[in-house]
Amino acid sequence: MSSSPSPFGQNEWLVEEMYRKFRDDPSSVDPSWHEFLVDYSPEPTTDSASNGRTTTAAPVTPPTPAPAPAPEPKAAPKPAAKTEAKPAKPAKSATPAKGDESQILRGAAAAVVKNMNASLEVPTATSVRAIPAKLMIDNRVVINNHLKRTRGGKISFTHLLGYAIVQAVKKFPNMNRHFAVVDGKPTAITPAHTNLGLAIDLQGKDGNRSLVVAAIKRCETMRFGQFIAAYEDIVRRARDGKLTAEDFSGVTISLTNPGTLGTVHSVPRLMQGQGAIIGAGAMEYPAEFQGASEERIADLGIGKLITLTSTYDHRIIQGAESGDFLRTIHQLLLDDDFFDEIFRELGIPYEPVRWRTDNPDSIEDKNARVIELIAAYRNRGHLMADIDPLRLDNTRFRSHPDLDVNSHGLTLWDLDREFKVDGFAGVQRKKLRDILSVLRDAYCRHVGVEYTHILEPEQQRWIQERVETKHDKPTVAEQKYILSKLNAAEAFETFLQTKYVGQKRFSLEGAETVIPMMDAVIDQCAEHGLDEVVIAMPHRGRLNVLANIVGKPYSQIFSEFEGNLNPSQAHGSGDVKYHLGATGTYIQMFGDNDIEVSLTANPSHLEAVDPVLEGLVRAKQDLLDTGEEGSDNRFSVVPLMLHGDAAFAGQGVVAETLNLALLRGYRTGGTIHIVVNNQIGFTTAPTDSRSSEYCTDVAKMIGAPIFHVNGDDPEACAWVARLAVDFRQAFKKDVVIDMLCYRRRGHNEGDDPSMTQPYMYDVIDTKRGSRKAYTEALIGRGDISMKEAEDALRDYQGQLERVFNEVRELEKHEIEPSESVEADQQIPSKLATAVDKAMLQRIGDAHLALPEGFTVHPRVRPVLEKRREMAYEGRIDWAFAELLALGSLIAEGKLVRLSGQDTQRGTFTQRHAVIVDRKTGEEFTPLQLLATNPDGTPTGGKFLVYNSALSEFAAVGFEYGYSVGNPDAMVLWEAQFGDFVNGAQSIIDEFISSGEAKWGQLSDVVLLLPHGHEGQGPDHTSGRIERFLQLWAEGSMTIAMPSTPANYFHLLRRHGKDGIQRPLIVFTPKSMLRNKAAVSDIRDFTESKFRSVLEEPMYTDGEGDRNKVTRLLLTSGKIYYELAARKAKENREDVAIVRIEQLAPLPRRRLAETLDRYPNVKEKFWVQEEPANQGAWPSFGLTLPEILPDHFTGLKRISRRAMSAPSSGSSKVHAVEQQEILDTAFG
C-alpha cells in the first residue's frame, strides 16, 4: 500500500507525456509547466516495471536451443533461482495467438492500467439513490431560455449536480476526506478545502479519446455564479490544452457523468487520494413507462429519474453517512432555496419552478384555471417583467400571486398536460408549458405591457395578437445599425465630457438606448409615408438628440460650447444650448422614404412644452388638411414627446395635455410618448415622488397602451418603438413607452449623486453601459466581430475629434451685450383695417342663413335677428364687432381658430358663434359661410371654434403652439374670466412673453381676458394687467384694453393683417357687453382704423372746447363709461377724459400729440379701478414720467388702495370704493 499516492491521480499519464515532450523540446510545452517539470521524476510505469511488455503480434520464431544444463552439485540447497514468470502472474509475457493483434499500452491507456491496479487497494462501497429529475429539468429550461435571450451560454445538468454536491459536502465534510498512511499509521486526512474533480472527455488530434480529471479549487467558498465561471474555465482550458499542474492536483471528491452516454447506473472506481466519487446516470422515465405516450405520462404525472451513486472509501466513510449525503443532494435538487440562489446568481428575476405535489383535480377544473392564468398574465404580467436594468433589489424576484401557477391550483406536473385555450396564440389546445412560455415571452421579459385598461376590445385584441406572437429577431444589418446608434450616442457624451469638463449639458449617459428607440419611431413613421415627426423633450439628452436624431451639425453644437455666437442670430437674450430647437430630414436606412424631423425649443420648466407641441402639430396637420377635418392620410404629422419619470408623474400639465388627446378641437391622431425613466428626480427617489406603481399610470386616463421596456435591451426598445407607431396609425391614439434606465452622473455634470443615493450609485459606478453590453452580446452570438465593433466606434470618435479641432480654430466673435428684438418686426404704417358695408351685411345675413329645417332656440333667434339689423343699421355691440372682425378675416382667406371654456356661446352668453338645433342638437356655425365667396369659390379661410377642456395651462400652451405651427392663422384663446389665466402663467412667462427673445420663436397668439371691477369678488375681476405689463419689454407683446366695439374690431383685424408675429393680450369687457353706450356706428367700421389713444367724442366731433380743460383724467377700459356719465351729469367742461387703448407698447407719439391739444391743463391723473399696486399704474407711474417728462411730471393716481387681492368680496364695499374713485376724480 503506497503511503504517498501520486497527487495527479488518473491524470498522471498526461503529466508523464508532458515530461517526455519537455525533455525532448521544452518549447513544445506550455511555459506554465516548466517550473514543475524541471524537478519532475516520473514513477516507473507498468511496462517498465515488469517484463510483461506486449508487442504487435507476428509469426512466432522458435528460440535458439540453449545448451544442456550442467549437472547440479550435491551441495546444500540454495534459494530457488528466479524463473520466467509463471502464467498465473501478470508479469509473465503472454504469447498472442496466431492472427491476433496486440498494442502496447502507453500514455493514458497505461495510466489507466496503473490507476485501476492501484484502485484495487482501496476498499470501496457504493450507495445508490434515484432522484426525481423533473424539477431540475424544468428549471434548467427556464435558466437556459433566459441566458439565450440575454448574454448567451448554457447551464448543464452537471453544473447543477456539481453545485449540489459542493453544498452537500458542507453538511457532510467527512465525504471530502481521504485515507493515507502517515508515519506508518493509517490516517484520515480532512483537506482544508473542497476541490471538486471533473472528469473531462478529450479528443486528441489522432481521434483517440482520453479522460482527464481537473479540479475546481476551493468550491465551498463559491456562489453559483463563481462556481460556473470556474467550471467553464477548467473545461475551456482542458480543451485548449492549457491546464497546469496545479489544475490536476489536489482533487478531494469527484463527479463523473456517464449518463451523457445513456448509462443509467454507474459504480466508478475510486482513486487513491480521494474519499468519494459521485456518479450520475442518465435521466429516464421508469422502465415500466418507457413505452407510454407523452400524453399518458403527463396524465399520470410521471417524471424522469436520475440515479446517483456514491462510491466511497469504506475505511473512513460509512454507508449511513454516504446514504445521508445522497439524501441531502436529493433534498437540495427539490429545494426552493437551492434554486432561488441559482436564479439570483444568474440574474434571473423570476421565481423558479417549485416542487409541489400533483393536484388530483380533473382536467376540466384545471382548464378554467388555465384560462384565468392567461387573463392574469394579460392583466398583471408587467409586474413580473424584467424591466429594471439596475435591479437594485436583486434579492426579490419579480412575482405576483396572480401569476403563480400554484395560486391557480396548478403545479409542475401540469406543465406537460394539454388544455383548451380557445384560440390563444392561434391554437385551440396547448400544453401548459407552452402556454406559460408564450405568456412570459409576451409579458414578462424585457417588455411589460399594460393594455387591459383600454375599453375598446378591438384595440386589446390588436395588442394581444402582436405581443403574443413570436416576433422576428432583427437582421444582422439591423443589429449593426442599432449598435451604430448606440456608438454615436455614447461617443457623443464621452466626447463632450472629455472636452468640456464641468460644463452643464445634462447628459444622456445611462439612457443612450433612447437614441435607437427614437430612430426606430421616426423610421417607422417614414415607413408609413407620414410627413413629419415633431419632437418635444426636456433638457436631459437634448444635445445628443440634436446631433444624432435631428442632425444638427456637430460644428454648431461645439461652437455653442466654445461660446461662439452667430452674429445673424444674436438678437435677444438667447438661451442655454440645451434649450434650442432645430430641424432636419431623416432618410431611411433600410427603406426608400424620408421624413422631416424637427425639435421644438423648450424651457427648463419640465413638461411645459407638452401642450405647445400638440398645438404646433395640430397646426401643421390643419395646414396639410390632414387634421381632424381632413380625410386623406389623417394626422400625417406625428408628435413625439420625451418625458422624465418624476415630471411625468408629478407635473399636472401632463394630465391636462393627455386630456386633450381625443377632443375634436385638439386631437393630433396620437402622440408617441417616451418616458426616459432614470428612476430618480434630481435627488428624489420614486417612493417620494409618486403614489402610483408606475410613473406612467396617469396615461391610463385616456386608454393609452403603456409599454415598459428595459433600456439595456436595444432590440426590445426598437421593437416597442415600431409597435407604438403601428398602434398609433391603426387607432389614432396616444401610446406611452416607459424606458427604464439610469442616470450615469448627477442631475448635472457638477453634481455628486452618491451623497443622496449611495447604494444606487455604487451599482451604477460598476455597471457596464448598454453599448458595451449590446456589443458583447452581438459578438457572443457571432453577429459581428470585435474588430468591426471597435472600428465603428473609432470612426465616430474620429469624426467628432476632427470637427472639434475645426471649431477650436474658428475665429471667435467678440461678445457684446445682447441686442433687443424690438426692431426685428414693425407694424406697417398704412395698414387698412376698414371694410365696406357689403362685408358687414354679408356677415349679418350669414346669421340667418340657417340650414333647412334647423330649429333655433327661442332665446337665440332674437340675437341672430339683432345682428342682421346691426349690420344694416348700426349701433354695433361688442360681441357682433368681434364676429365682424373674424368673419371678414375668414372672407379674406384667413384661418381663424377661437377656443376656450364655453367659447362657442361665450361665458356671458354674448357670442353665439355656434348655434345648436333645439331639436336635433346639430350645430350651425354662421361664420363658416364666409369661407365661401358669393360665387361659390372657396376663400381659403376657415373658422375653427371649439369649447376647450376646463384647463388653462394646457389650453393656452396648445394655442401658443398652434400659432407657432401656422404663423398665418389667427389664433385666439379666451379665458372664462381673466382671473383664471394665471393657471397658464408658465406658458405666459416661458413662451408667450419671451419665446422670441430666447429662441427666435415667433407667435401671433391672441389672449382674450375678461376684466373689470363689477363687484363679483376677487376671483372674477382681474386679468392681472400688472403682470403682463411687467413681462412686456422689447416689443415682446401687444397689450390692449379697447373701450369701443369698433376699436376692438380694428385691433383684431390689424393683428390678423399686419404680417408680424407677436402675441396680443386683450383685456375684454364683461358688463360693457350690454352697455348701451358701448356701441359703434357703421362708419367706425368702414372708415376708421385702430386708435391707440381715444379722446371723448365731443372733442373729436368739434363740439367741446379743449381750452376749458384744466383737469385731465387718463384711463383705460370700462371705467371710462362711468367717468363719462359722471362728467355729463355734472356738466364738467373743465374735465377731459383720455383713454389709452394700447397699454404696451405705449403710443408715446400719439399720447404726446393728444395731450398737447389741452394747453391749459393744471392737473393730470391716472384713473383706474384696480388697486394701487395692480392694473396699469405700477408700470405707468414709472414709465410715463420717464418717456414723456414734459407731459407727465407730477402725474397722480386715483384708484383703490393697495390690496393683496384684486378686489373686495363684498358688492357693497365694491360700490363704496367705486364711488370714492369717481368722487376723487371729479373732486
Swiss-Prot record:
Ranges annotated as biased composition (Basic and acidic residues): 23-37
Residue spans of biased composition, Polar residues class: 43-53
Pfam families recorded: 2-oxoacid_dh, 2-oxogl_dehyd_N, E1_dh, OxoGdeHyase_C, Transket_pyr
Record field: catalytic activity: glyoxylate + 2-oxoglutarate + H(+) = 2-hydroxy-3-oxoadipate + CO2; 2-oxoglutarate + H(+) = succinate semialdehyde + CO2; N(6)-[(R)-lipoyl]-L-lysyl-[protein] + 2-oxoglutarate + H(+) = N(6)-[(R)-S(8)-succinyldihydrolipoyl]-L-lysyl-[protein] + CO2; N(6)-[(R)-dihydrolipoyl]-L-lysyl-[protein] + succinyl-CoA = N(6)-[(R)-S(8)-succinyldihydrolipoyl]-L-lysyl-[protein] + CoA
Domain of life: Bacteria
Entry's Gene Ontology molecular function annotations: 2-hydroxy-3-oxoadipate synthase activity; 2-oxoglutarate decarboxylase activity; dihydrolipoyllysine-residue succinyltransferase activity; magnesium ion binding; oxoglutarate dehydrogenase (succinyl-transferring) activity; thiamine pyrophosphate binding
One GO process term, biological-process aspect: tricarboxylic acid cycle
Oligomer and partners: Homodimer. Interacts with the FHA domain of unphosphorylated GarA. The 2-oxoglutarate dehydrogenase (ODH) complex contains multiple copies of three enzymatic components: 2-oxoglutarate dehydrogenase (E1), dihydrolipoamide succinyltransferase (E2) and lipoamide dehydrogenase (E3).
Task performed by this protein: Shows three enzymatic activities that share a first common step, the attack of thiamine-PP on 2-oxoglutarate (alpha-ketoglutarate, KG), leading to the formation of an enamine-thiamine-PP intermediate upon decarboxylation. Thus, displays KGD activity, catalyzing the decarboxylation from five-carbon 2-oxoglutarate to four-carbon succinate semialdehyde (SSA).
Name of the protein: Multifunctional 2-oxoglutarate metabolism enzyme
Species: Mycolicibacterium smegmatis (strain ATCC 700084 / mc(2)155)
Lineage: Bacteria, Bacillati, Actinomycetota, Actinomycetes, Mycobacteriales
